[in-house]
Amino acid sequence: MNPRLRHWREAASVLLAAGAPGRRSPSPLGPCDYELLFLQRSSRSGFMPSAHVFPGGLVEAADFSAEWLRLLPAAPRCGLGAVRPPPPGGSRAPLFATDRQPLGSPLPGEVAFRICAIRETFEEAGILLLAPGGRPREGSGPAPSLPAEQLLPAAELGEWRRRVQEDPACFLQLCQRLGRVPDIWALQEWSNWLTPVGRAGRGGRRYDTAFYLCCLETRPPHTSQDNQEIAAFLWSSPPEAIERFKSQEIWLAPPQFYELCRLCNFSSLNDLHKFSSDRALEGCERWLPVTLTAADGFIQLLPGDELYPEDPDYTGEKKITMSTDKMVEDLMKEGSVFHRIVIKNTHSLAVYVNIQAKYKHMNPLMINTDSSNYNSRL
């Protein structure tokens, strides 16, 4: 945790992809042999109520506990590889770059945020992403799902889930009980999103969220919503999720929509796993979407876009607003260097990117939910 932060809180989330071979995809984007886990937030939530999101939540002091060092390997970063220096003109996301020692934790942020994402996945969805012993899993493919017979009886596991929800420190006790550790090595660093100033939830809630990607061989056998923060769960391929969003079956916030468009580049779980593993040590930068209000909608500008400010107002203290009387279509015709999400209404989103992706990452497919041409190029 970072108690020095005043304008947002730190969080972690995981894009959990599970193999689904032989499935049929009705999407015009084509077949896909894996599914993602989506959780529908409660309608009573103070932040993005009823939205379909990836598992995750706020980092807690227990995620940074020195006690984890008794379970995890003693190697530097608990066996995680060292992220390479950022490219020229780039920067390491502060979320990961912050030295946690002066903040009272010997556990690196790269480890603690993974523990947070794994703990939250158990709290919200009942899924345990654990590995045996205190060493990285051998093998280069997607991680195996923890078999049901290796878990505790359902009633006992449910009681542990309730305890962890009430006290995150109990997650370490659960791992000790099972003789397993959080499978931090299965989570690959993927992206980092900071809530825009003008899109804060009730009480001005903003989050600096680490997004990880985790590929599992098969869907876990024990998924269930908690009926507290989470009202329902859904397993869906990225193309199908976009179709559901387009038909207003589900609602996705812009970061989730963007990441789905990026995942639509991968129809194979093995290809996705290899890509995420190969580029994970490249790291990522923090993205703060900056909102430009147009006459008929909004444009969320992302780093690299020609209209993205040189000095973004990260805290909101400058009270800077960007607005124009021009229509979105006119702004698109006038521009040439794009990294943006166009928002006409809650179910009308379009991603436009024609810049080179940094950190050896993949640009999203440029998808406009108002168009049937999903692979549109500018």
Swiss-Prot record:
GO terms for cellular component: peroxisome. It comes from the Eukaryota. InterPro entries: NUDIX_hydrolase-like_dom_sf, NUDIX_hydrolase_dom, NUDT19. The keyword Manganese applies. CDD domains: NUDIX_AcylCoAdiphos_Nudt19. GO terms for molecular function: coenzyme A diphosphatase activity; magnesium ion binding. The record marks 41, 47, 205 as: Important for coenzyme A binding. A motif (Nudix box) lies at residues 105-126. Its main location: other. It is an enzyme of class 3 (hydrolase). Fatty acyl-coenzyme A (CoA) diphosphatase that hydrolyzes fatty acyl-CoA to yield acyl-4'-phosphopantetheine and adenosine 3',5'-bisphosphate. Mediates the hydrolysis of a wide range of CoA esters, including choloyl-CoA and branched-chain fatty-acyl-CoA esters and at low substrate concentrations medium and long-chain fatty-acyl-CoA esters are the primary substrates. Highest activity seen with medium-chain acyl-CoA esters and higher rates of activity seen with the unsaturated acyl-CoA esters compared with the saturated esters. Exhibits decapping activity towards dpCoA-capped RNAs in vitro. Belongs to the Nudix hydrolase family. Monomer. This is Acyl-coenzyme A diphosphatase NUDT19. It comes from Gallus gallus (Chicken). The lineage of its organism: Eukaryota, Metazoa, Chordata, Craniata, Vertebrata.
